[in-house]
Amino acid sequence: MASAMAGAGPAPGLPVAGGPVVPGPGVGIPGKSGEERLKEMEAEMALFEQEVLGAPVTGIPTAVPAVPTVEAMQVPPAPVIRPIIATNTYQQVQQTLEARAAAAATVVPPMVGGPPFVGPVGFGPADRSHLDSPEAREAMFLRRAAVAPQRAPILRPAFVPHVLQRADSALSSAAGGPRPMALRPPHQALVGPPLPGPPGPPMMLPPMARAPGPPLGSMAALRPPLEEPAAPRDLGLGLGLGLKEKEEAVVAAAAGLEEASAAVAVGAGGAPAGPAVIGPSLPLALAMPLPEPEPLPLPLEVVRGLLPPLRIPELLSLRPRPRPPRPEPPPGLMALEVPEPLGEDKKKGKPEKLKRCIRTAAGSSWEDPSLLEWDADDFRIFCGDLGNEVNDDILARAFSRFPSFLKAKVIRDKRTGKTKGYGFVSFKDPSDYVRAMREMNGKYVGSRPIKLRKSMWKDRNLDVVRKKQKEKKKLGLR
């Protein structure tokens, strides 16, 4: 049978070694087989990957030469030859990405293109054949361009090689292994100060706060549709979700979240619960304030996870704390308050105890408490040459016709009680003081005319005497 086939020549529609494809009956020359189209598509994708990475195209054939007839029917399609990546390539890519992120941190140009191309990982031969048509390819690129309008290019790598994707997917199954490139957090200098506490497991987002989408296991799961790549986009939150997506995810996750948020409180033995703390857990000193008599619920925004975890201690410190009730006195004690006259007497009594009127004359000093009976700001007149019959009432009656008259007193001997022949009269108004000095001088009070002089009682006070002595020493008189 083989000789018959050899004698008959090449089969129609199959390529001959070193020659062109022989078209079969009813088959046009411009038509291509599925294998050739698959090879061209893989070569085009490999070239696109190399262009994105910026490396020269090496070792990738554009097309595979024709295969003999018998072998083409039995051998499966040859795989695409990919370049061998060295062991240090991962670190070099990381350093390159960090350098680009640091350079773009100062100036962030708007990203015009669509999301980065992930590659044909996870596609079967049947899926690849469907993407060959121009309609499917145009629809796929239009869909990518419409999904993500603009994203900051500094927050994730532009392209991830397939070998690194397979290596990361194999290592992510072990605990503590590195996360995929697209799921890694951005550079530390772009996010802000690091959170205190040990680092947590990869992506500590609770199920209710995570946006609906494919699982976060490996890059192979991020196949089209590419609506929401799991990369951080908002530096203000430091998470992979925006405010709108996070709120929708929280509302759709649990219907009883509103009831649970009212019961969440920080008390003597509690800490902020629920999705309030996202990422590494806060220290106990920040997450748990001082115990209060009555705990207050946290704001609803913190419970929903709409605020970053670093602002939770600030909110806890700004909460209004209940003041202890003031002890109210019994009703009977309200009438026992100290009245104002008692307060005035108390104020006057204090200076009286501290104030001492020390007099000095002829080299001797003594205390005269009788001066405390007079007003310190009055205008005082000395009345001399008084008769023995003149007392305080007679002297006051003589000067009482002046409106601002205050007090009149005759000085007597303490031991015998006899008058010393002089006294004092005080006025509040200086005009009355001047009138009394002019009108009453030489008038009869009792059986004798009185003599009026300006009172010099202040000149014998100890403080005044010392002040005058200092002034005389300065002038050089003594």
UniProtKB/Swiss-Prot annotation:
One GO term (biological process): negative regulation of mRNA splicing, via spliceosome
Region (Disordered) location: 1-33, 171-209, 317-354
Residues where Asymmetric dimethylarginine is found: R151, R156, R166, R179
Region named Necessary for interaction with HNRNPK: 234-478
N-acetylalanine PTM positions: A2
Highest taxon of source: Eukaryota
Entry keyword annotation includes Ribosomal protein: no
Subcellular location: Nucleus; Cytoplasm
Biased composition regions of type Pro residues, renumbered to the chain: 193-205
GO cellular component: cytoplasm; U4/U6 x U5 tri-snRNP complex
Subunit details: Interacts with HNRNPK.
Family: Belongs to the RRM RBM42 family.
Protein's recorded name: RNA-binding protein 42
